[in-house]
């Protein structure tokens, strides 16, 4: 008898989130994908169906960060990204539904005049995000102590979320992607950007599973 291998694929760039979902435990279902291999069962974890505007892993990454921002009584969320960053759009929407102002530090100062032609920045602006555009050379130094101090002087009481949303709280949120129902899978596959989703999956996986 063939040893059946079960593979779960988790998409990275999708959309999700809803008002105060930060307080909820959200799960997604596994959709069977038919293949031409009888010894393989392939499933797609539908994190994209959690919400239309905050993508699956974006919701997971933001959940505990927003909770922490509210706990610290911060007035706004500040983060970084490019012209077509799903993270920028997700932060803008999540902030708006949680009563937090949002600030996006955007790579490319030429984009300041192109907001109407950019669907991502237009969406973020429509949900209240304020932009600070940087030249591409200046953007490379965005996490320097000098620049962070400049941001503090300009925007005051903000909660800083790294580019792509990955930090310890983001990893904690991504650990919730896998549930007890997913323990049947032998392999768990996902695409990788900043590594936050992958780290959460590794932490939450069972000893028999390979990531």
Predicted features, each with a name:
Residues 1-211:
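PLP-dependent amino-acid enzyme catalytic core
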């Amino acid at each position: 008898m063939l040893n059946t291998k079960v593979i779960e694929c988790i998409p990275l760039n999708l959309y999700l989130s809803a008002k105060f979902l930060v307080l909820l435990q959200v799960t997604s279902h596994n959709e069977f994908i038919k293949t031409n291999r009888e010894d393989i069962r392939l499933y797609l974890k539908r994190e994209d169906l959690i919400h239309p505007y905050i993508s699956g892993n974006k919701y997971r990454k933001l959940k505990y960060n927003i909770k922490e921002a509210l706990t610290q009584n911060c007035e706004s969320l500040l983060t970084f990204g490019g012209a077509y960053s799903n993270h920028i759009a997700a932060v803008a929407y999540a902030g708006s539904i949680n009563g937090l102002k949002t600030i996006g530090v955007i790579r490319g100062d030429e984009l300041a005049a192109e907001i109407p032609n950019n669907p991502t920045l237009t969406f973020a602006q429509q949900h209240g995000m304020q932009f600070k555009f940087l030249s591409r050379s200046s953007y490379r130094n965005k996490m320097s102590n000098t620049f962070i101090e400049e941001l503090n002087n300009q925007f005051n009481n903000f909660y800083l979320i790294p580019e792509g949303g990955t930090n310890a709280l983001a990893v904690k949120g991504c650990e919730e992607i896998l549930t007890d129902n997913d323990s049947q899978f032998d392999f768990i596959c996902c695409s990788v950007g900043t590594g936050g989703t992958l780290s959460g999956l590794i932490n939450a996986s069972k000893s028999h599973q390979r990531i």
